[in-house]
């Protein structure tokens, strides 16, 4: 495509054919019509001519500088005068930001402005943009001239790309003007489309054809300099670039046309909205000020003929009217302030008033938009802590507190604005009001614990396994453990049953094993769950002569929930009734399959009494431990779990701690739940004082501030201040959560109990030696409650019975249960004086049975009918003023005067009532036995007939039991 016609080249450059022919003639190329062909040499001659005509002269450029003032009024820094023009050139970034701000803040043109004013405003804006572009071009020309002095050959040699892209540079707008037009295309479309991007490759001093030097007559064209012929590859590349440039121009023209149409529609809609707003404002103004004509808002209001107007008042009204039209105080602002509030729309006129220093005529910037409040609802993401007040919740959702209270009342909660609600209720309220509720992250001191755990890294070493012995009551768990320990623990337990979690560690030839002995009674479910939580391996003890029992099934469930492996010890195989195969079958039904049957559970037949296969059981436990590869860091702060806790009168709070990792030392600062303190003493399970304990070793510790809850995690902290802070925070958090839930529960109970008779309540105060015992006892007693009699555990705690417990019993009418504890002398004396009953127990069965008997005594007795005799009516005697008298024969039993009677006719009960009189002959008698005749009357009933039978019975009360 080396030869093209003049018409094609003109179409490619988007220039008229006549202008291109004229420039070709000036360059020395003789072409007469648009159909003449153009060669590459012709194009290069034209390029050389235009470069010389519009390019640099090689000398210095002098720029006349005039001093003037620039007024800045929240827009582009430009002031136009009649004779001279001074331009303050911002940077490209500032220019783009200012143009964007001017477009977004411009107020729409008032409807009464003519089309000529709008065109004049657009022309003025285009002139300002052109002036900025020319100034930038002059600065760039000066800079390029300096660079040209240093390297003239490079400046004078035009690039080959300019030959096709810049033949008409004298009439081409600078690139900066194109950028300004593109930025203003949304609000102020340009008359000319943007030039191709290839023109931006030209130096600024070559593109600027509208500078001061361009006004001078052009010099005659220099003779053409012969240029080397380009290769075919370069020509193909140029053709491809030209094609892309043409496609880009077409795309830009389409975009510009679309923007112009969109702008026209927007202008029409704005004008229509302005007219409607203006009409509404004029109607409103007409109602407020009838003395002012609505047709001429600029003129002063004339006086009404039938009503005199005060001159001062009229003057003030006139000034207000001028202010409404933007010609009052706002028009005379000094120093560019333009009045008190230029940025706010006044009386619905969305115009921005611009003032000048000398109070010149106003300039109204069109397309300025006033602020509009958001109409769409705002959805907040609300983080809800454990407890939150109603006021804080409303603040987080940015709504009024009344709305939150209203929503809670709809849910049935009568709350005040300062009342606390729990997290679950708050999340429901947040969702109800259309926001997104999420539980808040732990923004509390406990986050310090996680950071500290990550910071400490120590080498993990092998540790002993923790083995929990579980099973049904009386299946021989503790006896099995006794044989392993060679001790007699069962004899020390009351009733021969375990009522505490015992923690022991045993040294075997193959290593150390830590055992946890859990109670098998159903009341100690929580203890068994804690034992399974802290364990590595579970030994499930099943009696060979008893089989699978309820607590055996529960122990299997705990082990599966904790995800720990099991070893089944089939105990009591030395008994005659032992049947180990039946045990295997029953356990298989509960998904505990022996390994010899293809399962993964080891079954060992043992006898705790004779010591059979005990070594095989330990071997199986250690084999499971090897498979688990149990490790824990040793040289690190200790972490563990509270297995049991109690309050000792002489030593204070005593807790049994199973160390799970690290080394616990005497004097460490320990945090366990809401309790903390420095360890003052440590003893092992044999009562021997020790100074440190490693992983998987159980110890008793002294020195905590309070009795911790069994099952709490414990860890050593380096700072007592931090431990105190975390413990106090937990206490407050638990208290708030508990109170919030109690309040909700009270309201629920109030509605549930509405309309029901009040049930009797048996109040109990429980004091036990360890926490696990009073937990089990309180849970068992609450299970005894019925609809008629309820057990109310007012208080339960660890330690001996004190005077405060007795005083609480006096105030509430409760009795006190002491489980393995006693009352001191002062408490006993106070209880005797106030008739407070204190009962001591050391076996949980006895306590449950006595409470059950007391509850049975509180039940209302049951009424039963007891038949005493049968009577046959043989004659009916009617006596006036008395009624019908039945002459009867007692056929069975005895008839008493105060008995109840049931009238039976044809084996159908006709009436049930009482006897009013009983006589034998004429004498009143108390009773008549079988075989004797008597006369009787039924109270309030006379419809008796011969042949009827009377069944006499008494109502007796029978005591009920639970």
Swiss-Prot record:
Keywords noted in UniProt: Cytoplasm, GTP-binding, Initiation factor, Nucleotide-binding, Protein biosynthesis
Residue ranges, annotated region (G1): 471-478
GO cellular component, as recorded: cytosol
Positions of region (G3): 517-520
Molecular function (Gene Ontology), one example: GTP binding
Biased composition (Low complexity): 145-157, 219-234, 270-283
Binding site for GTP: 471-478, 517-521, 571-574
Domain tr-type G, chain residue ranges per copy: 462-631
Chief location: cytoplasm
Biased composition (Basic and acidic residues): 117-141, 173-216, 235-269, 338-354
Intracellular or extracellular location(s): Cytoplasm
Region named G5: 607-609
Region feature Disordered, mapped onto this chain: 101-366
Keyword Electron transport: no
Record family assignment: Belongs to the TRAFAC class translation factor GTPase superfamily. Classic translation factor GTPase family. IF-2 subfamily.
Name assigned to this protein: Translation initiation factor IF-2
Organism for this UniProt entry: Neisseria meningitidis serogroup A / serotype 4A (strain DSM 15465 / Z2491)
Lineage of origin: Bacteria, Pseudomonadati, Pseudomonadota, Betaproteobacteria, Neisseriales
Gene name in the database record: infB
